[in-house]
C-alpha cells in the first residue's frame, strides 16, 4: 500500500511500482481509494466540493465502508493471483479524518475490520513535506480538493506521523522518499525493501 499527502507523488509511484512487478513477470493489480464504487463515488464528490462536506467522523465511516467493499470486491479476489498495489489505504483515513489522539484512536477502531480482513505486507509512506506537496499541487493547475491547502496539508502530515507512531508495532510501515527524490528513485527504494 502506498500512502502520502496529496501532491507527494503517490499515484505516479503506485503506477511505476506496478510496472516494476510486471517487468519481472510478477502479476500485479493496481487499485486506489476512494474506489469507483457507490461509496467511493460519493466520497469523491464530497472531496471535490460538489457535495456538502460531512463531519470528520461521518467521513471516516464512509472511507472505512468503502475500504470494506474494496477489500471484498477487488483486493481479496486479486490477491489470489496477483500482488496488489494500492494508492491509499487505512493510513490516509487515519490522517485525513482525525485531528488529535482521541479522534485518531476512533478512526483506528473504524478500520479494525479492514485490518483483520487484509493487512498489507508493506505500507510505504512517501515522506514529502507539506510545503513541497503544495508547490506540486499548485503546479498541476487542477481544481483542488478540500484538503489541498498548505495549512490542511500540515495538519494531515502531523496526523500521518501520529498514525505511523501509533501503528509501528503492528504494521510494516516504511518511510520512503524525500522532496528531492524522483518517483523512479522512490520506487527503487521501495523495491529494495520488497525484495529483501
What do these predicted regions represent?
Residues 13:
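Hydrophobic positions on the alpha1 helix immediately C-terminal to the Walker A/P-loop
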Residues 2:
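Hydrophobic anchor at the beta1->P-loop junction of P-loop NTPases
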Residues 31, 85, 122-124, 174-176:
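Hydrophobic/aromatic beta-strand patches that form the interior of the parallel beta-sheet core
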Residues 18, 131-196:
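NTP-dependent small-molecule kinase module
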Residues 91-158:
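A glycine- and Lys/Arg-enriched "phosphate-lid" helix/loop adjacent to the NTP-binding pocket
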Residues 10:
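Conserved lysine of the Walker
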Residues 5:
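P-loop (Walker A) phosphate-binding loop of NTP-binding proteins
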Residues 20, 26-109, 114:
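ATP-dependent small-molecule kinase phosphotransfer cores
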Amino acid at each position: 500500500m502506498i500512502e502520502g499527502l496529496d501532491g507527494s507523488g503517490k499515484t505516479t509511484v503506485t503506477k511505476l511500482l506496478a510496472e516494476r512487478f510486471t517487468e519481472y513477470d510478477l502479476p500485479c493489480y493496481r487499485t486506489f481509494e476512494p474506489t469507483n464504487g457507490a461509496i467511493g463515488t460519493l466520497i469523491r464528490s464530497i472531496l471535490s466540493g460538489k457535495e456538502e462536506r460531512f463531519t470528520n467522523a461521518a467521513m471516516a465511516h464512509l472511507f472505512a465502508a468503502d475500504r470494506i467493499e474494496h477489500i471484498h470486491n477487488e483486493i481479496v479476489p486479486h490477491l489470489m493471483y496477483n500482488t496488489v498495489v494500492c494508492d491509499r489505504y487505512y493510513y490516509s483515513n487515519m490522517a485525513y479524518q482525525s485531528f488529535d489522539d482521541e479522534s485518531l484512536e476512533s478512526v483506528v477502531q473504524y478500520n479494525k475490520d479492514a485490518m483483520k480482513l487484509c493487512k498489507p505486507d508493506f505500507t510505504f509512506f512517501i515522506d514529502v513535506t507539506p510545503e513541497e506537496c503544495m508547490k506540486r499541487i499548485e503546479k498541476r493547475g487542477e481544481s483542488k480538493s478540500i484538503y489541498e491547502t498548505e495549512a490542511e496539508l500540515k495538519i494531515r502530515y502531523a496526523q500521518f506521523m501520529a498514525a505511523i507512531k501509533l501503528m509501528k508495532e503492528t504494521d510494516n510501515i516504511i518511510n520512503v522518499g524525500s522532496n528531492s527524490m524522483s518517483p523512479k528513485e522512490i520506487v527503487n527504494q521501495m523495491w529494495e525493501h520488497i525484495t529483501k
